Swiss-Prot record:
Main location (coarse class): cytoplasm
Keywords (A to Z) from UniProt: ATP-binding, Coenzyme A biosynthesis, Cytoplasm, Kinase, Nucleotide-binding, Potassium, Transferase
Organism: Herminiimonas arsenicoxydans
Any one cellular-component term (Gene Ontology): cytoplasm
Family: Belongs to the type III pantothenate kinase family.
Protein name: Type III pantothenate kinase
């Protein structure tokens, strides 16, 4: 079994791919799971019942989580080599045009790879809406152009509560559809949703202007995507597990038989 792990700031998502099933298709796996950041101890138990022969991980949540993941894999699979995915000048069919390719977050690069393998030969805007919202442009030929980073929906709302005297912490929900709210809680939600949707729409407009001959797809992913999606005035394609699809693509490119 091939274990793929997407360790983010809030949740750890993982899948297991059956390497004996012949030709691999990115995004097709045997079993999937997730755990909250504070629940990493449960991962070893979840993985222990499988025969894991290869592990590919993306971690953007720091050294402490990396050590916890190493311990979980050791407990579940023994002393096997861990492959830590990092951004390089090229991988999985995507070329990284960052000035310093290694500086690009591994999750953003993997998401771009996943989007490109799912929707090849067309320009893409990849919006991943999590703790942070990242909005990246990929050309039809697989060139990662660059992107935007802004606070995620929940982080944006909590920043108002934490840094102002009179604005409350609010529960984010999808029922706030009016742009001009008649109460403070709804006004915060409306403003944060408008900022997120507006950034995505601006990115799509800019990338589409650079590629007038190609049909651009906006790919929407991440835990807050379903809250933001109804407020977009543009067409989009909702995709789950984009980072894991990208990792699966890289694994296939480097060793097709796992």
């Amino acid at each position: 079994m091939l274990l793929l792990v997407d360790a983010g700031n809030t949740r750890i998502k993982w899948v297991l791919v059956d390497c004996s099933s012949g030709q691999q298709t990115p995004g097709s796996w045997h079993v999937a799971g997730s755990a909250a950041r504070a629940e990493t101890a449960q991962l070893a138990q979840a993985w222990s019942s499988f025969s894991i022969s290869r592990v590919l991980l993306s971690n953007v949540a720091g050294a402490e989580l990396r050590e916890e993941l190493e311990r979980a894999v050791l407990h579940a699979a023994g002393d096997i080599e861990l492959e830590w995915f990092a951004s390089t000048p090229a991988a999985g069919g995507v070329r990284n045009h960052y000035l310093n390719p290694a500086q690009l977050g591994s999750d953003r690069f993997a998401a771009a790879i996943g989007a490109h393998v799912l929707f090849p030969n067309r320009p893409l805007v990849v919006a991943t809406c999590g703790t942070a919202t990242t909005i990246d442009a990929v050309n039809a030929d697989g060139a990662f152009v660059g992107g935007m980073i802004l606070p995620g929906l929940a982080l944006m709302a909590s920043a108002l509560a934490n840094n102002t005297a009179q604005l409350p912490e609010v529960a984010l929900h999808a029922s706030s559809t009016q742009p001009f709210a008649d109460n403070t809680d709804a006004a915060i939600v409306s403003g944060c949703l408008a900022a997120q949707a507006g950034a995505i729409e601006r990115a799509v407009k800019a990338h589409a202007a650079a590629h007038p001959q190609g049909e651009l797809y906006c790919i929407l992913a991440g835990g807050a995507a379903d809250l933001i999606a109804p407020h977009l005035s543009i067409a989009y394609k909702r995709v789950d597990n984009l980072v894991l699809i990208g990792l699966h693509t890289v694994a296939i490119h480097t060793l097709p038989t796992c």
